């Protein structure tokens, strides 16, 4: 099992990798650009790495819920992190790398909230959260439930207990 700071780096690296793949795959679809040039930002390592501190406890708390409830909760959580981290970066630097208020080429400005979040990405975050469950379980296996032998037995009720 990896320590938390090691998992921080693993989530950060995985996030960078998937962002580069995602942005590279959008080129042909969005612009007809078949160079498949993906990119990310140094800012993203700590943002993705924060999954070790934010996503893991949420996943542990939601393990018994149906997949669609977990995915919805993860998407909402990712939107919250995207908005909070984007607002912090904007406050520190005056802009954010993924500002959704910018037009892309001759396309209109996409629906967004303050340039920080795009509702269109909800399915992406939904699926990403469910995918992160598998990464989390590989990096830090879930605790095993106690065996029945280790669970104290309840004393059977007697007539004197009921009186």
For each predicted feature, which ranges?
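Aromatic-rich, lipid-facing transmembrane alpha helices and their immediate juxtamembrane interface loops
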Residues: 1-163
